[in-house]
Amino acid sequence: MTEILPIPAFNDNYIWSIQSDQGDAWVVDPGDAQPVLRHLAENHLTLRGILITHHHHDHTGGVNELLANHPVPVYGFMRSAIKAITVPLQEGDRVDLGDFSLEVLETPGHTLDHISYFGDIAGAPRLFCGDTLFSAGCGRLFEGDPAMMRQSLDKLKRLPGDTYIYCAHEYTLSNLRFAQAVMPESDEVNKRKLQCESLRARGVPTLPAVLGEEIAYNPFLMAEHPVVRRMAQEVSGSPCATATDTFAAIRAWKDRF
């Protein structure tokens, strides 16, 4: 059976290892090679491929060292500047990995070359979304604009509600503190925060999250919600006439929160 395990890196990154009981492994966004090499050795795994969501160094910094030890395919966006990519991808492509395959979704906003990978693994839908969607949050807009990012998030919102979300950072508690500021009376936010505080106190990741639950407490997926819009209006001093305006206002608020 295939399982998905987090490999912690740096202060708050997760490199996701998709591994089969036959000893094959694919890793997502290896910003650091050393923890991946240790994980492979300790679990007697053979690296079969590297999946990249975007070009930032904390997601790609370990690629060349891994390739020096394991010459495997590197998957990434077709117009990315990452030189190590050997299998360029675009929207709708499928990546065949052993007994399963992942669909490529273009999700720009955080960066222009950002893609996500979605598919059924071990009987459940899974999404590897890098820095586009976080639990209770979303990525900063380093290269894209609010309309672009909101379009990407809307694309992800349309995935099945039982989709497990494997994002690349342990930002959940920080994001939930912001969500409480946006929706101070939300039972869903408060419940999720208590759950995650308990997990982190035991050293357990808050991920994967579940998409159908995120839609109830992630303010960046709730730009149409009247409470979110009202708080965006108060903080920004603008009318927030559209959901994209609301999204832009709360993203700017989060940047300085």
From Swiss-Prot:
CDD domains: hydroxyacylglutathione_hydrolase_MBL-fold. It catalyses: an S-(2-hydroxyacyl)glutathione + H2O = a 2-hydroxy carboxylate + glutathione + H(+). It is an enzyme of class 3 (hydrolase). Its EC number is 3.1.2.6. Zn(2+) 1 binds at H54, H56, H110, D131. Binds 2 Zn(2+) ions per subunit. Keywords: Hydrolase, Metal-binding, Zinc. Zn(2+) 2 binds at D58, H59, D131, H169. GO terms for biological process: methylglyoxal catabolic process to D-lactate via S-lactoyl-glutathione. Pathway: Secondary metabolite metabolism; methylglyoxal degradation; (R)-lactate from methylglyoxal: step 2/2. SMART domains: Lactamase_B. Its cofactor is Zn(2+). It comes from the Bacteria. GO terms for molecular function: hydroxyacylglutathione hydrolase activity; metal ion binding. Belongs to the metallo-beta-lactamase superfamily. Glyoxalase II family. Thiolesterase that catalyzes the hydrolysis of S-D-lactoyl-glutathione to form glutathione and D-lactic acid. Monomer. NCBIfam families: GSH_gloB (TIGR03413). This is Hydroxyacylglutathione hydrolase.
